[in-house]
């Protein structure tokens, strides 16, 4: 009788872990259920809080990871209290891992929902998701925080359809003495021009990324997704703002919303508060319109897991029969899965969020047709063998003009043919590439081939420079750890 009373009272909602819970071992407070995937700096697991029965997400981060980034992520989540931002409940140290306990969003990320359903989103669905996302950005920007990695993979949905901002691994805080940041952080295809150019940026950098995300939700991928990320970062600040591949397929309101987000001048770009008043967002429908696509995505995921389960069970039976033929008493172990549902530990297409993945997901999706059936190569989502990597400090000096020209001029001496002594070999100002029209195909190919080794050389120099700054910090952290151990 006593057990029933403990197990069945009305359970309160978990808001924050109390001091008593935080002093216990995490296994005493949570039951870890399964691995969901990879987030920034760590693996993410689904778990249940024993006292309340509430499902949570736990990010387990190796202590040897970048400690400053982990502390930054925790700090930003601790300060946030919004229904449109993933909640933080508390953290633990366990062996060599830091456990960060946060809100669980059962439907996963928007990008995963697109992949699971093999469909892009409708305007109504996009408007509803953008409305919640803008409320989250309005809150963050009011708190003088920049997310810096807005994309469909970092917008999570709970099972009711509410969108929440997640993955603060690269988020930054604006202070009164630092009104604009000058570091290049984010995912290249979503990055604002001013971020790439390192001319300083503020909260509206997130708005550019939101505009790219709107295109991503409509077309299945961001602009420039099919070209090398390092080439994309040249094109984003140089080219006009991107738009839809087929603008005629989209309403004037949606097209104008994206246009307001993708203004190259940050001073003229709309804020989150202003965009919440845009007709496209104001006419957004309730979250109930997202329930069908959420249920459909979750059904696909469940069927895939059941199929995997049947395959594992079948393999177990076949191996068991073989083992019985080998020996009447000894049964060999069949890996470490033992007939359980396999959950992937890898991410696809750089989603970098606390979401569930199947190993077989990319191979089973086939080709995603986007917008129209008569569109050929442009209308399909191509599978990539490599994942989109988040931008790293290797971009930090990539766009400094003098350094570029020095590298180009020195490299040009070894370039064969007409490129060798050509005055056209310098990077043109203001994106003036008209002179290329007079070149032969052979000359253009030589120029293209010359770019890659030059890029690799610059990246290596920047990497070494970054490492020389990073190493003293790592040494200082290690020294402090040793002193703490001595005490």
Curated annotation (Swiss-Prot):
Coiled coil regions, renumbered to chain: 290-310
Site feature (Cleavage) residues: 326-327, 349-350
Comp. bias regions, Basic and acidic residues: 303-312
Binding residue positions for ATP: 36-44, 59
Domain SARAH: 433-480
Modified residues (Phosphotyrosine): 433
InterPro entries documented for this protein: Kinase-like_dom_sf, Mst1_2_SARAH_domain, p53_tetramer_sf, Prot_kinase_dom, Protein_kinase_ATP_BS, SARAH_dom, STE20/SPS1-PAK
Top-rank EC class of the record's enzyme: transferase
EC number of the protein: 2.7.11.1
GO process terms (BP): apoptotic process; hippo signaling; protein tetramerization
SMART domains hit by this protein: S_TKc (SM00220)
Region (Disordered): 303-332
Activity regulation field: Inhibited by the C-terminal non-catalytic region. Activated by caspase-cleavage. Full activation also requires homodimerization and autophosphorylation of Thr-183. Activated by RASSF1 which acts by preventing its dephosphorylation.
Source organism superkingdom: Eukaryota
Similarity annotation: Belongs to the protein kinase superfamily. STE Ser/Thr protein kinase family. STE20 subfamily.
Protein's name according to its UniProt entry: Serine/threonine-protein kinase 4
Organism of origin: Chlorocebus aethiops (Green monkey)
Gene behind this protein: STK4
């Amino acid at each position: 009788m006593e057990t029933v009373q403990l197990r069945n009272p009305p359970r309160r909602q978990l808001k924050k872990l109390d001091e008593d819970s935080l002093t216990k071992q995490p296994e005493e407070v949570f039951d870890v259920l399964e691995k969901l995937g990879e987030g920034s700096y760590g693996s993410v697991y689904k778990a249940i809080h024993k006292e309340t029965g509430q499902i949570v997400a736990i990010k387990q981060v190796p202590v040897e990871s970048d400690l400053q980034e982990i502390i930054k992520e925790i700090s930003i989540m601790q300060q946030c209290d919004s229904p449109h931002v993933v909640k933080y409940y508390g953290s633990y140290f366990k062996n060599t891992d830091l456990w960060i306990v946060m809100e669980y969003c059962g439907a996963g990320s928007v990008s995963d929902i697109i992949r699971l359903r093999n469909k892009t989103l409708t305007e109504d669905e996009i408007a509803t998701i953008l409305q919640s996302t803008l409320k989250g950005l309005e809150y963050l920007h009011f708190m003088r925080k920049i997310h810096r990695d807005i994309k469909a993979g970092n917008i999570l949905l709970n099972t009711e359809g509410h969108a929440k901002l997640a993955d603060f691994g690269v988020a930054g805080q604006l202070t009164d003495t630092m009104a604009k940041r000058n570091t290049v952080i984010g995912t290249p295809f979503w990055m604002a021009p001013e971020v790439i150019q390192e001319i300083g940026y503020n909260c509206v950098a997130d708005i550019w990324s939101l505009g790219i995300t709107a295109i991503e939700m409509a077309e299945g991928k961001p602009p420039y997704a099919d070209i090398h990320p390092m080439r994309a970062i040249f094109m984003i600040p140089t080219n006009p703002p991107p738009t839809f591949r087929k603008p005629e397929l989209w309403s004037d309101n949606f097209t104008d919303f994206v246009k307001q987000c993708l203004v190259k001048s940050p001073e003229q770009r709309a804020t989150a508060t202003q965009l919440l008043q845009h007709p496209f967002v104001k006419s957004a429908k309730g979250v109930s319109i997202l329930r069908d696509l959420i249920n459909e995505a979750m059904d696909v995921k469940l069927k895939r897991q059941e199929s995997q389960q049947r395959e594992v069970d079948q393999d177990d039976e076949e191996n068991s029969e073989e083992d019985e033929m080998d020996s009447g008493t000894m049964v060999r172990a069949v890996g470490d899965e033992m007939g359980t549902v396999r959950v992937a530990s890898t991410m696809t297409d750089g989603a970098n969020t606390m979401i569930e993945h199947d190993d077989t997901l990319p191979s089973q999706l086939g080709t995603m047709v986007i917008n129209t059936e008569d569109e050929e190569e442009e209308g399909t989502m191509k599978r990539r063998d490599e994942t989109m990597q988040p931008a790293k400090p290797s971009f930090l000096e990539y766009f400094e003009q003098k350094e570029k020209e020095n590298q180009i001029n020195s490299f040009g001496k070894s370039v064969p043919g007409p490129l060798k002594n050509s005055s056209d070999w310098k990077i043109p100002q203001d994106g003036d590439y008209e002179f290329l029209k007079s070149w032969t195909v052979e000359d253009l190919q030589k120029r293209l081939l010359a770019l890659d080794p030059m890029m690799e050389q610059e990246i290596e120099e920047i990497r070494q420079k970054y490492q020389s700054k990073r190493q003293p910090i790592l040494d200082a952290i290690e020294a402090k750890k040793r002193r703490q151990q001595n005490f």
